[in-house]
């Protein structure tokens, strides 16, 4: 009998921007690396350097100057399965150093994902990696678990997609889930664009990573956008400097809050969509009138794009303006929200009551990939 340590389930949250992976029962992911596959732009001239045909994650990131970087996941949906397989392979063998055929694997997916997508995930886990068991869970539901609630509305905003998912007593309400294809990567692109107006040019995939870092370190959300713009015009209090990898120092001011303002005003990037506050409100309004009060009182933020300072206050202000005046509104922004999907997965996969929920290899062999729709909902 293998001891329990050997058969710890693996939890892998495949985000558009970052993969978060580790062992069920841990309180944080062991491996966090970019969901990038890089291929050399030039053929190697140095003999014996042992060039690879593809690099994954941090290694691709560190060699980005000579690589073309591709993200296999776009807007939360896997668009390139060969590259995705490389990422999973890297996760299991290089990052976690485990044999996937010895561990059950819990994967995550965005809500409203195409059915074919989860079937393909299931197929790859069982046929390529020979896992003994697997499960696919919806990201936002896991975030709510991690916050210790069973009822609430989760605004999950990552690198590729944002969505609002109302959950009542542990069940997601699919008719009220709203998806917004506006997230961290669009903010990075917008920051690249507005920095160009300042005379700084960022164009390549490698330079995009620099701008992403700048966004993460310097951006914040204004409580009152117009007032903040006025302040920025008259004083230099919002200006901050940032050092580029080559030592050049650039200054950014109003761009710091103009960039994430797109979340509330998607028209900035030419999108005809409601902002995250309005999407959250619309999502609540699609729910039964009796449960709305519970949702307004438990608005939970999750994902890396909710890490901007000032987001909870602004969200609270905007939703208060939309909701009935007597309604008590509470926006919860847990400090670990960058990883709350993974943490929720870690909690779920280690529950004794969850153990009968896994899809076993035998069940897969009998029913094929479509079993995922019956067992994971």
UniProtKB/Swiss-Prot annotation:
Keywords: ATP-binding, Cytoplasm, Cytoskeleton, Hydrolase, Nucleotide-binding. The keyword Coiled coil does not apply. Disulfide bonds: none annotated. It holds the Pfam family Actin. GO terms for molecular function: ATP binding; hydrolase activity. SUPFAM superfamilies: Actin-like ATPase domain. There are at least eight actin genes in rice. Actins are highly conserved proteins that are involved in various types of cell motility and are ubiquitously expressed in all eukaryotic cells. This is Actin-1. It comes from Oryza sativa subsp. indica.
């Amino acid at each position: 009998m293998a001891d329990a340590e050997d058969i710890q389930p693996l939890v892998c949250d495949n985000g558009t921007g970052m993969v978060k992976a580790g062992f069920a029962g841990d309180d944080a992911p062991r491996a966090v690396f970019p969901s990038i596959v890089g291929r050399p732009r030039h053929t190697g001239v140095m003999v014996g350097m042992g060039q690879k045909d593809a690099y994954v994650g941090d290694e691709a990131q560190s060699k980005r100057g000579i690589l073309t970087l591709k993200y296999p996941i776009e807007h939360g949906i896997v668009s390139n399965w060969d590259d995705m397989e490389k990422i999973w392979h890297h996760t299991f063998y290089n990052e976690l150093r485990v044999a996937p055929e010895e561990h059950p694997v819990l994967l995550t997916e965005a809500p409203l994902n195409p059915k074919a997508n989860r079937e393909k995930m299931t197929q790859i886990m069982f046929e390529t990696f020979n896992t003994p068991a697997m499960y696919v869970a919806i990201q936002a539901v896991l975030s709510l678990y991690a916050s210790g609630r069973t009822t609430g509305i989760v605004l999950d905003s990552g690198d590729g997609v944002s969505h609002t998912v109302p959950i009542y007593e542990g069940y997601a309400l699919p008719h009220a889930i709203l998806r917004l294809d506006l997230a961290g990567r669009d903010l990075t692109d917008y920051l690249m664009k507005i920095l160009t107006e300042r005379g700084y040019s960022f164009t390549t995939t490698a330079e995009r990573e620099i701008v992403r870092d700048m966004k993460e370190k310097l951006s914040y959300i204004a409580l009152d956008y117009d007032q903040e713009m006025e302040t920025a015009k008259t004083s230099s209090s919002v200006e901050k400097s940032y050092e580029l990898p080559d030592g050049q120092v650039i200054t950014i001011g109003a761009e710091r809050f103009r960039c994430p303002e797109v979340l509330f005003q998607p028209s900035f990037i030419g999108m005809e969509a409601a902002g995250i506050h309005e999407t959250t409100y619309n999502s609540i309004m699609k729910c039964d009138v009796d449960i709305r009060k519970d949702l307004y009182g438990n608005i939970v933020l999750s994902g890396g794009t909710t890490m901007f300072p000032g987001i909870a206050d602004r969200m609270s202000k905007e939703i208060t303006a939309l909701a009935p005046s007597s309604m008590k509104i509470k926006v919860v922004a847990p400090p670990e929200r960058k990883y709350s999907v993974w943490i929720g997965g870690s909690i779920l996969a280690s529950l004794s009551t969850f153990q009968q929920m896994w899809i076993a290899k035998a069940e897969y062999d009998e029913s094929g990939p479509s079993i995922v729709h019956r067992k994971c909902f």
